[in-house]
């Protein structure tokens, strides 16, 4: 009460109570009757959090938590994720992480593919030459078969198509004259260069002049001549060399060859030997 002008005036200025001055609010004010019941009736609101703040991401960002999660992660547990953990072989299926990719079978990736089984190596031995040519060391004149299809000796007079023996030394054709002379000539039209080769046994042939009706023979002094009948001097070993030329070596005089000089004359058998151009002959068809 304040006295103003001799009278008493009541002070009605609102003043904070004890609980308001302390700042404890209604919860801490025990002086107001029913304050506890009034506070319990009020709805409680939870504090709002910023949407960008995530406790899990915050925990994952801490060094201690990140290290602990890295240690607990098992090897090969990530399938198809971007993690840096190493996956087990074949565990990653289409992921873009840094783990090892599964083995690729038949693909174009960098993984190791299953190798196709290799073909078994060919058996060792002679191989056929290109375009049907024969291998070196084989024979070109095959044994003649009996007309009845049975086995036995080769029938006399059974010849193949006529041939011309072209010598590499000088380009001469082997010629057999009716008088028994033997030499070389370059003219293809000469009828005395037509020869028939008959296989007496495997790799052994006899050479007969068609027009001369004589057989090529190697004499004991190394001369070449034509004989009217077949003797043991008329058989020659036929061999295909590596340069596709044939050689004809005497079966009786095994170190002597049929040969022609560069002048077209025959060469003595005693002066012949392997590797000479004079002993190389190329069988050609006599029909052309």
From Swiss-Prot:
Region (Heparin-binding): 261-277
A single GO molecular function term of this UniProt record: histone H3K9me2/3 reader activity
Record Pfam families: FGF
Expressing tissues: Expressed in granulosa and cumulus cells. Expressed in hepatocellular carcinoma cells, but not in non-cancerous liver tissue.
Compositional bias of kind Basic and acidic residues: 68-84
Chain positions found as Symmetric dimethylarginine: 108, 110, 112
Task performed by this protein: Acts as a ligand for FGFR1, FGFR2, FGFR3 and FGFR4. Also acts as an integrin ligand which is required for FGF2 signaling. Binds to integrin ITGAV:ITGB3. Plays an important role in the regulation of cell survival, cell division, cell differentiation and cell migration. Functions as a potent mitogen in vitro. Can induce angiogenesis. Mediates phosphorylation of ERK1/2 and thereby promotes retinal lens fiber differentiation.
Assembly and binders: Monomer. Homodimer. Interacts with FGFR1, FGFR2, FGFR3 and FGFR4. Affinity between fibroblast growth factors (FGFs) and their receptors is increased by heparan sulfate glycosaminoglycans that function as coreceptors. Interacts with CSPG4, FGFBP1 and TEC. Found in a complex with FGFBP1, FGF1 and FGF2. Interacts with FGFBP3. Interacts with integrin ITGAV:ITGB3; the interaction is required for FGF2 signaling. Interacts with SNORC (via the extracellular domain). Interacts with glypican GPC3.
Descriptive protein name: Fibroblast growth factor 2
Species in which this protein is naturally found: Homo sapiens
Taxon lineage: Eukaryota, Metazoa, Chordata, Craniata, Vertebrata
